[in-house]
């Protein structure tokens, strides 16, 4: 008997998308699955649907099928056309019905403990020069009474009464395919197959207790905001003898009142007067470690930037130092006495400038307005 067209089997047209093909397969597989449909021929119908989906859900197989039909270049797409390992497509769909695949993690295998995170706020100076700080952190530690075993000292473990030592239990679930029996990890022993004769009175069988622990943290010289250090083995205790997790300390750096930081470089804003800008000057400015004298050349303008090499922050990885950049702003005086005004007017005249003096004082400006000046 000739095979039906795969598109016809699934009830879709040849231009159907992957999602449309998958949707059609889901609908038909629910209807004809042998565990649900007991009618004669349902089993063969389900196999036909599965075979059609296996081909049309695979791009390469679909291209070959569209070109050659059932008599493809590799001997067709029948039951001989693909092996058991190629059924991943619809096995993935049914995994949601039957509770997962066959691979199960050994519940008794050693597992590393969870990593923890702690946020530490430090000053700009502490970040630049480094320091040591003590922190207090609340975390799970190995129970001091049972040493992590979970059992009361002097007692032992016994076979789990719920799963009889299997570590897994069989349960029935209502699914879209009807009632399906699946295996799950035992909820009582969590897969170990054992339970306590008497749990530890301190940790109630958990093997851990929550305590506040003090730790010393080394703040590296040159650390920046949002960077972190790892304290190996200071995380949560491992499971089944596994190693402890790690503690990651994340730094939050407070801004400086003097400098702005960008990586290893720092910036300092320097205001200078009109006279200093015009004539030049030598000005003492701060750096990270001491004051230095900065030479301001005559004619310096607002926006001029001076670079002081290696006066920035030490690179946290040891790759030298950043630079200090000094940004210049020429400040215009807002209050002038008569003598200063006289000198500036004289300066303007020498430059051939005709200055129409304006007052910054509201009363003076009002008087000039009403006088028509």
Curated annotation (Swiss-Prot):
SMART domains the record matches: DnaJ
The cofactor remark states: Binds 2 Zn(2+) ions per monomer.
Q: Where does Zn(2+) 2 bind?
A: 160, 163, 186, 189
Q: Which GO terms describe its cellular component?
A: cytoplasm
Keywords in alphabetical order: Chaperone, Cytoplasm, DNA replication, Metal-binding, Repeat, Stress response, Zinc, Zinc-finger
DNA damage in keyword set: no
What cofactor requirement does the entry state? Answer: Zn(2+)
Renumbered zinc finger spans (CR-type): 130-212
SUPFAM superfamilies for the chain:
Chaperone J-domain, DnaJ/Hsp40 cysteine-rich domain, HSP40/DnaJ peptide-binding domain
- What family does this belong to? Belongs to the DnaJ family.
Kindly give the PANTHER family that the UniProt entry links to this protein: CHAPERONE PROTEIN DNAJ, DNAJ HOMOLOG 1, MITOCHONDRIAL-RELATED
| Recorded domain comment | The J domain is necessary and sufficient to stimulate DnaK ATPase activity. Zinc center 1 plays an important role in the autonomous, DnaK-independent chaperone activity of DnaJ. Zinc center 2 is essential for interaction with DnaK and for DnaJ activity.
Q: What is this protein called?
A: Chaperone protein DnaJ
- What's the encoding gene here? dnaJ
């Amino acid at each position: 008997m000739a095979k039906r067209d795969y598109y016809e089997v699934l009830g879709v047209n040849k231009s159907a998308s992957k999602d449309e093909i998958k949707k059609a397969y889901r609908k038909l597989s629910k209807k004809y699955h042998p565990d649900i449909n007991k009618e004669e021929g349902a089993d063969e119908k389900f196999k036909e649907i599965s075979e059609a989906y296996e081909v049309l859900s695979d791009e390469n197989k679909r291209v070959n099928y569209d070109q050659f039909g059932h008599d493809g270049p590799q001997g067709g797409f029948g039951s001989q056309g693909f092996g058991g390992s190629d059924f991943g497509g619809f096995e993935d769909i049914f995994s949601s019905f039957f509770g997962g695949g066959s691979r199960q993690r050994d519940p008794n295998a050693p597992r590393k403990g969870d990593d923890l995170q702690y946020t530490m706020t430090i000053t700009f100076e502490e970040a630049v020069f480094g320091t040591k700080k003590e922190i207090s952190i609340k975390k799970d530690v190995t129970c001091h009474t049972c040493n992590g075993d979970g059992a009361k000292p002097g007692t032992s473990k016994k076979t789990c009464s719920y799963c009889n030592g299997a570590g897994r239990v069989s349960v029935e679930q209502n699914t879209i395919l009807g009632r399906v029996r699946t295996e799950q990890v035992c909820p009582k022993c969590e897969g170990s197959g054992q339970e306590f004769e008497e749990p530890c009175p301190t940790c109630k069988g958990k093997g851990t207790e929550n305590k506040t622990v003090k730790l010393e943290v080394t703040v590296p010289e040159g650390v920046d905001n949002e960077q972190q250090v790892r304290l190996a083995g200071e995380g949560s205790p491992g499971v089944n003898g596994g190693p402890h997790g790690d503690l990651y300390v994340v730094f939050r750096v407070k801004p400086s009142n003097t400098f702005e930081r960008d990586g290893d470089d720092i910036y300092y804003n320097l205001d200078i007067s009109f006279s200093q800008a015009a004539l030049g000057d030598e000005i003492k400015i701060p750096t990270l470690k001491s004051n230095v004298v900065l030479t301001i050349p005559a004619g310096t303008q607002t926006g001029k930037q001076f670079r002081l090499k290696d006066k920035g922050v030490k690179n946290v990885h040891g790759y030298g130092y950043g630079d200090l950049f000094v940004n210049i702003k020429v400040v215009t005086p807002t209050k002038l006495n008569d003598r200063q005004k006289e000198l500036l007017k004289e300066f303007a005249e020498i430059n051939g400038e005709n200055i129409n003096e304006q007052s910054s004082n509201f009363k003076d400006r009002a008087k000039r307005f009403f006088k028509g000046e």
